[in-house]
Amino acid sequence: MSMQALHALRSLYFISSRIGQNSSSQHMFVTLTAVDILAQYPALAENLLRSIQPNDMCQIPAHPHERCLDLFFLNTAELFTIVLSPEASEELLVTAAMPYLAAGANKHLLEIFEAAHSVVLAVFAIPRNGTIAAKHLPFYIDNLFAVRINPFIPIHAT
């Protein structure tokens, strides 16, 4: 039932993401309750994430609807980072986030860029994912500092 609820919320995400998923207490209640229940069953949580993972995790989709589904995946996946195995975290979460991290300077992808950062940081923060952090941290840092944080502050060559 929890998986079905999250699948239904995914189908409506193109609407709820525009009005703000935090603007409805009922939406938040259903989401967090479903996540809380599924988090008790890590294998089911992983199955859910596999069923909603981006179609092509190596590139950003051209269609806005597909990018919206990617945003739902990243936001939902972040809630399950603590119960996923390191292998699933790297295969599903880090892989899905990487294209958006690399596209950080694109202002049209800012919300997904931030979701990708959040999910990657959540994966890196879990002690058992130390090898994942060691493997992907150089790429993450290079991309983080390649993006101009404030467009009004000029970058000077040294």
Named regions from a protein language model:
Residues 1-31, 41-81, 93-100, 110-120, ...:
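HEAT-repeat alpha-solenoid elements in large eukaryotic scaffold proteins
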Residues 92, 96, 120, 135, ...:
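Cys/His-enriched low-complexity segments
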Residues 103:
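Short basic (Lys/Arg) and small-residue
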